[in-house]
From Swiss-Prot:
Residues in S1-like domain copies: 1-72
One GO molecular-function entry: rRNA binding
Protein name, as recorded: Translation initiation factor IF-1
Swiss-Prot/TrEMBL keywords: Cytoplasm, Initiation factor, Protein biosynthesis, RNA-binding, rRNA-binding
Subcellular location: Cytoplasm
SMART domains according to UniProt: S1
Function: One of the essential components for the initiation of protein synthesis. Stabilizes the binding of IF-2 and IF-3 on the 30S subunit to which N-formylmethionyl-tRNA(fMet) subsequently binds. Helps modulate mRNA selection, yielding the 30S pre-initiation complex (PIC). Upon addition of the 50S ribosomal subunit IF-1, IF-2 and IF-3 are released leaving the mature 70S translation initiation complex.
Subunit-structure text: Component of the 30S ribosomal translation pre-initiation complex which assembles on the 30S ribosome in the order IF-2 and IF-3, IF-1 and N-formylmethionyl-tRNA(fMet); mRNA recruitment can occur at any time during PIC assembly.
Species of provenance: Moorella thermoacetica (strain ATCC 39073 / JCM 9320)
An annotated GO cellular component: cytosol
């Protein structure tokens, strides 16, 4: 999938799930299932409930996403 096709939105981590998955509530109120991107995983960045994150959504499946950035 090309980088131009993704939708980037901000959200807040609601709960951690097994296998590095997280339930994220987006700014518009929707809740999505998101996994951690490879760069965040490689740099050992911890994501905890309550963290503000940027999530990339595919236009084909708006219920799943990838966490690409955690705000400080």
């Amino acid at each position: 999938m090309a980088k131009e096709d993704v939708i980037e939105v901000e959200g807040k981590v609601i709960e951690p799930l097994p296998n590095a998955m997280f339930r994220v509530e987006l700014a518009n109120g929707h809740r999505v299932l998101a996994h951690v991107s490879g760069k965040i995983r490689m740099n050992f960045i911890r994501i905890l409930p309550g963290d503000r994150v940027t999530v990339e959504l595919s236009p084909y499946d708006l219920n799943r996403g990838r966490i690409v950035y955690r705000y400080k």
